[in-house]
Amino acid sequence: MLRTSCTSSLRRVVGKYVVSPLVASQIRFATSSVRSQPYLLNSELTELPAQFKRYSSILLTEKPEGDVPESGPEPSGESGISEKSNVENDKHDGNDEIKPEAEKNEKDEIEKPEIDKDAIVETDGVSESSVENVSGSSSAAGGASAPPSGNSNNNNNNNNNNNDNDEPNEIVTNAGTGLYPPLLAIPMKDRPPLPGRPFAINITDPEVIRSIYTIIDKREPYFVLFHVKDPNEGDTDVINSKDSVYNIGVHCQIIRHTTPRPGVFNVLGYPLERCSLADLSTPSEKKGETETRKEGENFPTSYLKGLKVSYATVKPVKDEPFDKTSTDIKSLVESLKALLSKMGAKNPLEKLQIKEGTELVNDPPRFADFVGSTIHGDPKKIQEILESLNIQTRLSKALELLKVELKASLIKENTIHNLSTKADEYQTRLFIKEFIKELQKRAGIVESDDKKTSKFDERLKHLKMTEEALEAYNAEKAKMESQNEHSSELGVSERYLDWLTSIPWGIYSKDRFNIKQAREILDRDHYGLKDVKDRILEFISMGRVSGKVDGKILCLTGPPGTGKTSIAKSIAESLNRKYVRIAMGGIQDVHEVKGHRRTYVGSIPGRIISALKQAKTSNPLMLIDEIDKLDLSRSGGASSAFLEILDPEQNNAFVDNYIDVKVDLSKVLFVCTANYLGNISPPLRDRMEIIEVNGYTNNEKIEIAKRHLIPDAAKKAGLEGGHVVIETKTISRLIEKYCRESGLRNIKKLITRIFSKASLKIVEEVEAREGESKSKSEEAKSEAITGSVTEISVEDATVKAQSIEEPSVESASQKVDEAKPVESEELKSDEEEEEVVKLEIPDDIKLEITSANLKDYVGPEIYTRDRVYDIPPPGVATGLSYSTSGNGDALYIESILTHSIGSGSGHASIHVTGSLKDVMKESASIAYSFAKSYMVKNYPENRFFEAAEIHVHCPDGAIPKDGPSAGISFTSSLISLALQKPLPPTIAMTGEITVTGRVLAVGGLREKILGAKRYGCNTIIFPKDIENELEEIPEEVKEGVKFIPVEWYQDVFDEIFPNLSSDEGNEVWKEEFNKLDKKKASNKKK
């Protein structure tokens, strides 16, 4: 095309001359104008346009290459060409490849110009006088790289024909202030442009569009562009304040403008240079002070005053001087060039553009701007490059952004590559699998059924599934075989068939009903617990008689550490049944018991089906451990699920939500354990057969420690040879002073601690002996060496020395080589874990643990006193308590007068403390009421309760207390205070009191007896209603204790206050009340 040939010809001409920067910029503008003018596409055009003729004549006035004119005098300010013009021209030289963005896709109509290196004109060494000598030259926008264009009568768009007078008018800086006249100011939210690279911006404000048409008509197509600080501000084409934009912007020239759609005006601009904002006029200011201030002023762009746009007075910004030979700058330029080459190699679309940019390496400022314009960085980071006047800083910031972009490009490329590789591998594997499968089918190597279902068919041969389960199996198997191998539902079906065939359908272990063997197993594993063992043997004997053991639900309840779980294991061993355990702690949802439906991702069966799979039989002993830990307030659904599981009438058709077929649990022997029955819901408790496992007595604890705990601890510590001896008295003291609870866990811990400390002492003793023996052997060896020294003559020594051959080099090296494997073996043995050899303990080393040295092993005693009061004062009664952990203890009730009756207020009151809960507070209130009525009835002259201010306290205030069993203790304490008679310290009592004086039954008599004996009480008053429980309490527990059953409180009174006459009880508080009566009489007179 003619257009391309024109530009190419002009380039060839330029290559033969060294021209001034201004002329070079004019030539570049001419070539770009030719490429951008559509009328040049006319095939009838036969001569060069006027621009080419004019600039060709300018070229002829230049001197040929090598004859560079000398520097002339400095140009004056009136010429319109300042020092800034030359610097900026030099800075922007070579940017002739300005191609409007709107023409990038016009491949069919406009040919892409070739990049000609000759078009980049070197301007180094060109003096300012050479610019002065160019006739008719002018500096557009103060020396910017793009030259002015000719006049246009109506330049509304770029499709109007240009003529020879289309040059832009000259706009220069003021010689005094260095400022440009006011120019149109436009804000930009997108990334700010950098000098040397064209950009496009869309304008929607009608006033701004009108002003652009105006400056084009005036042949002054210049404006300034500033980046906004906050991109979230309203979408506007007017700058409303200086604070809303950055201070450094760009001075631009309009290259082309189009209207892509109604209401949108697209401007292709070319950034000429950096500029700083000196003053800003906004549409709002023009009506006020600013307009008044500028009235009468006359400047080249004064026509902008009448438009509702923002215009600014700007000052060109110069780069800081720099040294091109600086090592730092060269290093930065080379780094940028290398990274750009990498980017070009990875992105062929940008390869040509990057190649053009790398040719600017000799001009670091323009090279930095090129890199900043090329990369897609954060607009704020680009603005930092724009504001960087220090060339080294500008290069550093550009390098930093380029590294980030390259890293992101690498990550993106690797991600795409990995995804593509995985997809290719998947397709390859899929093809190979399908190919092999087809070959196997044709060769008849495999059956048509899927291999994955064959393992389930193999399991099915050994199972006796119900019809419902078999139907579900076949349906799921058919579904699985019909699914694609890569379907997500395939895994769901496979897991379901796996669980369904893992249930032991029809598999039962043979029960063993041997009473003798069962008794031996129970006695072997447990000492005492006669009642529990008898109940279990009765249960087994029923199975022996009937020939089967139906699914029973046993519940072993008792304090912690009494062996409930181990009893369940012994029952399973006695019956020859598999043992599985389900812990109830933490179960808060019914789905954990009955499973989740298969609609949920990752659903599994519940605990019951999982336990059957683990047992591999349909009649295991299934231990529901700590069923009282089931939180009824949060997991009522789980408790309701156990109503079905533990009901023999319903559990033959248990349905798990995941399996969704009926499973027979009627042959399962359920054994539950609980610490406190009160935490189990009544409907669930009704389905169980309760077996109470009471706490151990001291004698039982001693025997269990001797038979089980001490041998186990000695075995774990490696001291089985009788090296540690614990006396029976020591065990008894350990129980009395350290662990009074009903269970065995604490005493087990203490015995383990004894053996651990004993092992330390034994090892220290053995090592001390080994050290002594070693030192003795060394002394003996040294003495032997000293005693065996013989005299050797000089001649013999010389002969012996000569007989020793000096080793050769070969032999020495051979020895070194032979030693190397030894070194490696030594290193290898060091790295490997050394096997610990058991210490051989001499038989004479023995440790005796006695009552005297017991505290050296387990620390100081915890329970130092057996009773609080040796001789209790009046108002102190000894009650008995029983905790849910199975421990019996003494409970003291203390009552005092807060004021003497004579000096008090005369009003009766009672105050109760000691962390008492509601039931116990009511019991104290009932006791107070009954005590008053009892004193009025039996000691009418004792007016104690008419004016007594009483404080009742129960010690151990940190421990919450509840229950009615302290009723007679409260009453006895109050009556003791009223009669001023102390109670015997050896008498303890328990029982609920009513307002009529009736004593009602309470629980935990066995544990309370043990607690009373520990505190030295040999007489126990208890309700007559529970007298029959004494028959079930072992004799060793009742030994040394006098039991007094009572039905009314009068029986209690007769026991604690024998031989108390009426006169003695009536005379107690007479003097105090006489004082009180006199005090009241005197108060009335006043």
UniProtKB/Swiss-Prot annotation:
Region (Disordered): 61-176, 767-788, 800-835
Enzyme Commission no: 3.4.21.53
InterPro entries: AAA+_ATPase, ATPase_AAA_core, Lon_bac/euk-typ, Lon_lid, Lon_proteolytic, Lon_Prtase, Lon_prtase_N, Lon_prtase_N_sf
Alphabetical UniProt keywords: ATP-binding, DNA-binding, Hydrolase, Mitochondrion, Nucleotide-binding, Protease, Serine protease, Transit peptide
Single GO BP term: chaperone-mediated protein complex assembly
Segment annotated as transit peptide: 1-55
Stretches assigned to the Lon proteolytic domain: 871-1059
Compositional bias annotation for Low complexity: 69-83, 124-163
Subcellular location: Mitochondrion matrix
Active site per the UniProt annotation: 965, 1008
A Pfam family hit: Lon_lid
Domain of life where this protein originates: Eukaryota
Record: residues binding ATP: 558-565
Residues in Lon N-terminal domain copies: 183-406
Annotated Basic and acidic residues bias: 85-120, 767-782, 815-827
Reaction catalyzed: Hydrolysis of proteins in presence of ATP
Listed GO MF terms: ATP binding; ATP hydrolysis activity; ATP-dependent peptidase activity; serine-type endopeptidase activity; single-stranded DNA binding
A GO cellular component entry from the record: mitochondrial matrix
HAMAP family to which the protein is assigned, alphabetical: lonm_euk
Family: Belongs to the peptidase S16 family.
Complexes and interactors: Homohexamer or homoheptamer. Organized in a ring with a central cavity.
Physiological role: ATP-dependent serine protease that mediates the selective degradation of misfolded, unassembled or oxidatively damaged polypeptides as well as certain short-lived regulatory proteins in the mitochondrial matrix. May also have a chaperone function in the assembly of inner membrane protein complexes. Participates in the regulation of mitochondrial gene expression and in the maintenance of the integrity of the mitochondrial genome. Binds to mitochondrial DNA in a site-specific manner.
The protein's name: Lon protease homolog, mitochondrial
Native organism: Scheffersomyces stipitis (strain ATCC 58785 / CBS 6054 / NBRC 10063 / NRRL Y-11545)
Name of encoding gene: PIM1
